Amino acid sequence: MPRLRGSGNSANLAGMSGDNFSDAVLVVLGHGTTLNAESARPVRQHCAALRQRKVFFCVSQACWKQEPHVRRVLAKLAAPRVFIVPMFISEGYFSSEIIPRELGFGEHPAREFPGTIWYYCQPVGSHDSMTGVILARAAAVVRQHPFPYAPKPADITLFVAGHGTGRNANSRKAIEHQVELIRAQNLYAGVHDIFMEESPRIADCYALAATKNIVVVPFFISDGLHAVEDIPVLLGEPERLVKERLAAGQPTWRNPTEKNGKRVWYSPAVGTEPLMADVILERVREAARKINNI
């Protein structure tokens, strides 16, 4: 594990002002993949937005599965405090076990070195403020595509679509929690979770919706394979047509599309919503407050 360079007495670093991050480096950590370089686009997007705010001394992007790799990014940093925020959709295997272990974190979410402290924050996707991100995505896709008219939320059934997997229940729990929070606001005629690999399935949205209008929001970080190809096909678009649109650089779902007697709007992934920058910042604030209170 590389040893960071820093300044000052590390014993006093944790006591700095919880909302003053002018001494700190933020590292936004994405999963990344060698199969799709665009998977890191949301990380770049939100890093750029946070740099403009000038809250941190420095904002760096990093990935686990592609360059710039998080270990190399951390090795080059020199700051009293380093906050690592996983740009992950849930508290799953990678964000909760693999990455903390490989970066040397034990049960405590902070590592102290001479002159610096690393903070490992909670993933963005499990934060309660993701409710606002989902609602922003749902409202925007209808507003941007009002044909033949923009229905009111009370005339829409909202679906939050996730992957779902029997290997880790947290993936499903994060979506179910958000559905409960949105449902409690009584904005939409109905709010449901649907999944690619668990029940209720993506295609079940047509039977579950009591309204003609449906909005589907994919609960994914990037507009990658699942969000751009798999879910449109599961919603009923021919696979050939989806691939042709993708190859031509066109949206793989036309908003709205009539399917099974319903009018369906399909939004971009939640991870590309600009409000995600606020979620990242809130995760940093929480980590700073938690350490200061220990």
Where do the PLM segments sit?
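Short, low-complexity intrinsically disordered segments enriched in A/P/G/S/L with frequent Arg
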Residues: P2-G6
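Active-site-proximal alpha-helix that buttresses catalytic centers in soluble enzyme cores
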Residues: N12-I294
